[in-house]
């Protein structure tokens, strides 16, 4: 992917307000993946990614940056919560499962790309199978197929099939029968589950079963079957592993929750252990997955945390060293809230306008109304827990509560949400100090 850092930041700007430093850091890291691939083979092996630690309060855009980056990257990407993992020896998921899950994501990605690449051939083959059911080949008295008489009719039906005029017609088709084996295992033993499922599914013979379904559904099933025939599974595995090793990105959220708090001498079960287990994976090691061995040397790791109780210095020194780029995200201001309400491509005000439009109600947010909403959300954050932009959801839901409830009875109305309307709807926030009802 040859998208430039400026283009990456511009794309992130369309969805996330502020946090320029964090956007620049991830943009450079993403571009460096492409730069590295342009180097000679020997030098490429020596260039390792500069992992990132994003520090900032909740609700300022850390997770959203990761989510949008995943779409931009067009590469294997996985987001995990550090708190979901336990030290080796404890019940729960081990950190190796991060790489295994990333490989699964990569496998799905390359499979989709391979299917898309062969889609035209698979589409033709699937259509032929449907047409064989609709128009069984005519045979003469000796059993030979008469193609000439049938060819023109098949072309007419193929055209109808592509136009969708036969979509709702039901037909009987032969589809590959799959043995679905559900195995329940304790947490942390997911790999054994997948291996047993593969074993049982592999033991079942390749049988087909007749199923009655609409042509539009049958076409999808047959398209998948034909595409699978055109794909080399072993080749896909190699491509998936290479994609993980060279382009994989892991986003680890809530990294601060596995820190041992300063001055706390209590037994934080497996917290430091999780950090120690993360060390070799981030530094570079080999993890065994069901598709083969995966080297983690060139996987990019982006960690994030609020660090409200713990501090970045509470991380193990070795782990700090493996996260050389530290980016601090700033708390959101009232002006930021105003921009969040209006500027993103799918801003909150736009979402509410479009939702109410489905009921025939026209909503208009005035500038002073938006300013009042931002002020209310900012004030609640200051008075209680600061949950960043998530507070806007709470305030807007309260503001729109009455309209949302009886919108179906108000079709055709034009409702203007200005400063006066907001002040009335959020009266208990504006006038009272008791803000408990807004605390999530």
Swiss-Prot record:
SMART domains: AAA (SM00382), ClpB_D2-small (SM01086). GO terms for biological process: protein unfolding; proteolysis involved in protein catabolic process. InterPro entries: AAA+_ATPase, ATP-dep_Clp_protease_ClpX, ATPase_AAA_core, Clp_ATPase_C, HslU, P-loop_NTPase. It is found in: Cytoplasm. Pfam families: AAA, AAA_2. Keywords: ATP-binding, Chaperone, Cytoplasm, Nucleotide-binding. One of its GO terms (molecular function) is peptidase activity. ATP binds at residues 17, 59-64, 253, 318, 390. Its main location: cytoplasm. CDD domains: RecA-like_HslU. It comes from the Bacteria. The keyword Lipid metabolism does not apply. One of its GO terms (cellular component) is HslUV protease complex. A double ring-shaped homohexamer of HslV is capped on each side by a ring-shaped HslU homohexamer. The assembly of the HslU/HslV complex is dependent on binding of ATP. Belongs to the ClpX chaperone family. HslU subfamily. PANTHER family: ATP-DEPENDENT CLP PROTEASE ATP-BINDING SUBUNIT CLPX-LIKE, MITOCHONDRIAL-RELATED (PTHR48102), ATP-DEPENDENT PROTEASE ATPASE SUBUNIT HSLU (PTHR48102:SF3). ATPase subunit of a proteasome-like degradation complex; this subunit has chaperone activity. The binding of ATP and its subsequent hydrolysis by HslU are essential for unfolding of protein substrates subsequently hydrolyzed by HslV. HslU recognizes the N-terminal part of its protein substrates and unfolds these before they are guided to HslV for hydrolysis. This is ATP-dependent protease ATPase subunit HslU. The lineage of its organism: Bacteria, Pseudomonadati, Pseudomonadota, Gammaproteobacteria, Pasteurellales.
